[in-house]
Regions:
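Generic detection of intrinsically disordered/low-complexity segments and helix-coil linkers/edges
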Residues: 3, 16, 41-43, 92, ...
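A eukaryote-biased signal for long
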Residues: 156-291
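N-terminal segment immediately downstream of the Sec signal-peptide cleavage site
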Residues: 18-95, 232-291
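Predominantly extracellular/secreted and cell-surface proteins with exposed
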Residues: 51-198
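Gram-negative bacterial Sec-dependent N-terminal signal peptides
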Residues: 1-13
């Protein structure tokens, strides 16, 4: 899921009162941190999501091409800044597998309906997916405000990530001929108000709705054909961590992605991985092995 997101605070400040005050920067940090991870440094949290992927192209109906099962294992650590105060940084790994929309079995290969070419499926294995620190004061010095909405006992927290940047597969002349990576990810979190504001609890039982609008995945080999993909999924934090994930994900982690049982270290300084950079690594490794 990519994915990127939010911020929070340290355990001593979050637990110093019985109720988190969303109107204060410290309260905003604590609430965001409870939704995203935990107010306890180094406590692993697992998000799971399940959904569908549709192909969308001009002039033809949308087509259900994949189901998906995904997870993200994360932890947060407290950070401080002399000008911006106390905050936190989130580190994570993210795995999402593509499933046959009829059988719900893991896809290892896929037949491109436009070309009838059988291609290897490259699942999402982004390690790491880390966030920038968030502090009690923003970059311009303003006090941090909680961006969620409280209504009828629920807290709703929307987050949109418009993505437009140089495509790692697009060559050296994108500023002249185009081909930038252009996508949108939308994360909508929801949590019970009493759960979120309870300062004695380090984590919230949060739910998430995730939408992604993106170009064709590079492993699909769609070339320059017009169109793209729409992802739609819902999920939540897992009370039992990795053990609470669906069997298909647990089996895939055990067999092919053993590092995904734990998050990266809190001091992880690696650049973030994306579906496009991961595909490049897989493709380049296979091409080198074939030579």
């Amino acid at each position: 899921m990519a994915s990127a997101v939010l911020a929070a605070m340290a355990m001593p400040m979050a637990a110093s009162a019985q109720t988190i005050d969303l109107s204060t920067p410290a309260g905003a940090i604590a609430a965001n941190r409870k939704i995203q991870c935990s107010t306890v440094d180094g406590e692993p949290v697992v998000y799971h999501w399940s959904g569908r992927v549709y192909a969308r192209a001009p002039g033809v109906p949308d087509r259900h091409v994949f189901n998906v099962e995904g997870m993200n294992v994360r932890q947060c650590g407290t950070v401080t800044d002399s000008a911006r105060g106390t905050g936190y940084r989130l580190v994570s790994r993210e795995l999402m597998i593509y499933l046959d929309p009829r059988t719900n079995e893991i896809l290892r290969t896929w037949t491109n309906p436009e070309t009838d070419q059988v291609v290897e499926v490259v699942h999402v294995a982004n390690d790491p997916v880390n966030s920038r620190p968030t502090f009690e004061r923003t970059a311009d010095g303003s006090p941090l405000r909680f961006s969620g909405r409280v209504n009828q006992g629920w807290v709703f927290l929307p987050f949109e990530a418009p993505l437009f940047y140089l495509n790692p597969l697009g060559g050296d002349y994108q500023e002249y001929v185009g081909n930038h990576y252009h996508a949108m990810e939308i994360f909508d979190f929801s949590v019970r108000e009493d759960d979120l504001l309870d300062a004695s609890r380090s984590r919230a039982d949060a739910s998430i709705a995730w939408v992604r609008i993106s170009p064709w995945l590079p492993w699909m080999r769609m070339g320059g054909r017009p169109g793209g993909l729409v992802f739609n999924a819902i999920g939540q934090t897992m009370a039992n961590g990795i053990d609470g994930l669906p069997q298909v994900l647990r089996d895939e982690i055990a067999t092919n992605y053993p590092d995904y049982v734990t998050p990266p270290p809190l001091n992880d300084a690696r650049p973030n991985e994306t579906s496009w950079t991961y595909f490049r690594k897989v493709f380049d490794a296979e091409r080198a092995a074939a030579q």
